[in-house]
């Protein structure tokens, strides 16, 4: 009998896992601050968390129909989640909410360039700071 090859398991430390934004109100609040940076692979929006919500950074992902069909949108969001998981814990600011918006080329963009896009957008957003309006 042939044995199935065992897949390597990813070690996920639950304390390091990113908290996701889920409500429409949170997405609209972040969009309303206008602290944003656009790059070829993504758009990043940022806002400080309201009140005392725990101080851990939170992140949301979105991809409109402009990105492509459902398969392309889901692939783009998966790639944004992977990029955020590798960049935000080290470079994101505690107490901030981030929204990553996929663009038309997100699903085909080389992963290294997607990481560079996110890092550059984080630097730009941290320089700008949120402007209420």
Residues covered by each model-derived region:
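Positively charged, solvent-exposed patches that mediate nucleic-acid binding
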Residues: 1-133
């Amino acid at each position: 009998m042939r044995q199935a090859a065992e897949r390597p398991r990813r070690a996920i430390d639950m304390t390091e896992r990113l908290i996701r934004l889920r409500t429409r109100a949170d997405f609209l609040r972040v969009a309303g601050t206008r602290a944003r940076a656009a790059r070829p692979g993504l758009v990043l929006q940022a806002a400080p968390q309201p009140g005392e919500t725990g101080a851990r950074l939170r992140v949301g992902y979105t991809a409109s129909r402009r990105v492509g069909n459902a398969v392309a949108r889901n692939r783009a969001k998966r790639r944004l989640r992977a990029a955020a998981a590798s960049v935000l814990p080290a470079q994101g600011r505690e107490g901030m909410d981030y929204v990553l918006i996929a663009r038309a080329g997100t699903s085909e963009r080389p992963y290294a360039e997607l990481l560079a896009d996110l890092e550059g957008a984080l630097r730009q957003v941290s320089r700008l700071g949120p402007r209420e309006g």
